[in-house]
Swiss-Prot record:
It comes from Klebsiella pneumoniae subsp. pneumoniae (strain ATCC 700721 / MGH 78578). GO terms for biological process: biotin biosynthetic process. Keywords: Biotin biosynthesis, Pyridoxal phosphate, Transferase. This is 8-amino-7-oxononanoate synthase. One of its GO terms (molecular function) is pyridoxal phosphate binding. Signal peptide: none annotated. The modification N6-(pyridoxal phosphate)lysine is found at residue 236.
Length: 385
């Protein structure tokens, strides 16, 4: 089979399964409203949980950073791209989250892949929650280590897998809040299982940091857990982009030597680091707490308003509120129905989620108003005019 035949077959299969992905260019894709081609919809697809992507102080910080540093880093942080702005952000993150060190990455995907690629060796074993992010599972499957997946949020099965004989080291992998189901990991029990086995725990808290816990320190702090490796990302609550790995001194030095995604990538623009430092100050402030309180109120309003609706609402109490409808066509039709009624929501289909669990991944933010949630509920209950 030629390359072209292989490509054509794969695309045909996606189309036949109603799983073909398309991008739609928008004027504004974050915040309360999504704007496209002169129209606007209430936006229930953005990960901008605290509404910070449009915050004037963060926008001004980026502009000031660009004036001072320019618009690009100019190279890898190992060459000339590591600025005072990067160092200040790393130090602030480490202080906030209670770790000796923080290392910046250009994305959460890159951070997760870099960690596993740098750490996993032939005789090792990676034990990951089966619903972990694609970046984690892909890196684990491509590594020389043995990959085992435990049943979602099942610390007992994790402990059983970690107890099996092994010549090398073990890495347990999970998320704080899962990106497609919106549920939380039982981190205290997972941490206890990894400690008992002498394993290292990696937690990706992309959807928890900034939103949960005191000063928004995230899922781990809220459950009084301190994993050896904590990944936080900046494209959700921070309203920007990028990521950081929190760890101890020795691990940070090791990653600086062996994390290829860090070594061989141009560093994030210093202006972005300035903006992220501004976002962090807001997240830690009274304003940040007010935004978290507003988000929590919107989540309660939505869940109480859903009542006994027939759609498959999960147990999530996070900003991610999936409605699992099962069939791809039904998910697409429901997304179109919402769009026609002025609400933008995205249908998520396999392979992003398991076959038979297509869904609308609704996301709520602090930028939403009470009437926005009411409108969404009206449409979902079938009362849209």
């Amino acid at each position: 089979m030629s390359w072209q035949q292989r490509i054509d077959r794969a695309l045909d299969e996606r189309r036949a399964a109603e799983a073909f992905r398309r991008r739609l260019p928008v004027t504004h894709g974050a915040g309360r409203w999504l704007e496209r081609e002169g129209e606007r919809w209430l936006n229930f697809s953005s990960n901008d949980y605290l509404g910070l992507s449009q915050h004037p102080a963060i926008i001004a910080a980026w502009q000031q950073g660009a004036t001072r540093y320019g618009v690009g880093a100019g190279g890898s942080g190992h060459v000339s791209g590591y600025s005072e702005a990067h160092r200040a952000l790393e130090e602030a993150l480490a202080d906030w989250l209670g770790y000796p060190r923080a290392l910046l990455f250009i994305s959460g995907f890159a951070a997760n892949q870099a960690l596993i690629a740098a750490l996993a060796e032939k005789d090792d074993r990676i034990v990951a929650d089966r619903l972990s992010h694609a970046s984690l599972l892909e890196a684990a499957s491509l590594s020389p280590a043995q990959l085992r997946r435990f049943t979602h949020n099942d610390p007992q099965q994790l402990a059983q897998l970690l107890a099996k004989p092994l010549a090398g080291e073990q890495l347990a992998v999970t998320e704080g809040i899962f990106s497609m189901d919106g549920d939380s990991a039982p981190l205290a029990a997972i941490h206890a299982a990894t400690q008992a086995a002498g394993a290292v725990l990696l937690v990706d808290d992309a959807h928890g940091v900034g939103v949960i816990g005191d000063e928004g320190r995230g899922s781990c702090a809220a459950q009084a857990v301190r994993p050896e490796l904590l990944v936080v990302t900046f494209g959700k609550a921070f309203g920007v982009s990028g990521a950081a790995v929190l760890c101890d001194e020795a691990m940070a030095d090791y990653l600086l030597q062996f994390a290829r995604h860090l070594i061989y990538s141009t560093a994030m623009p210093p202006a972005q680091a300035v903006a992220l430092s501004a976002a962090l100050r807001i997240i830690r402030s009274d304003e940040g707490q007010q935004r978290r309180d507003i988000l929590a109120a919107r989540i309660r309003q939505f869940r109480e308003g859903m009542g006994e609706v027939s759609l498959g609402l999960t147990d999530s109490v996070s900003a991610i509120q999936p409605l699992i409808v099962g069939d791809n066509a039904r998910a697409l039709n429901l997304a179109c129905r919402l769009r026609d009624a002025g609400c933008w929501a995205t249908a998520i289909r396999p392979p992003t989620v398991p076959v038979g669990s297509a869904r609308l991944r609704l996301t709520l933010t602090a930028a939403h108003h009470t009437e926005d949630i009411n409108r969404l509920l009206e449409v979902l209950h079938g009362h849209s005019e």
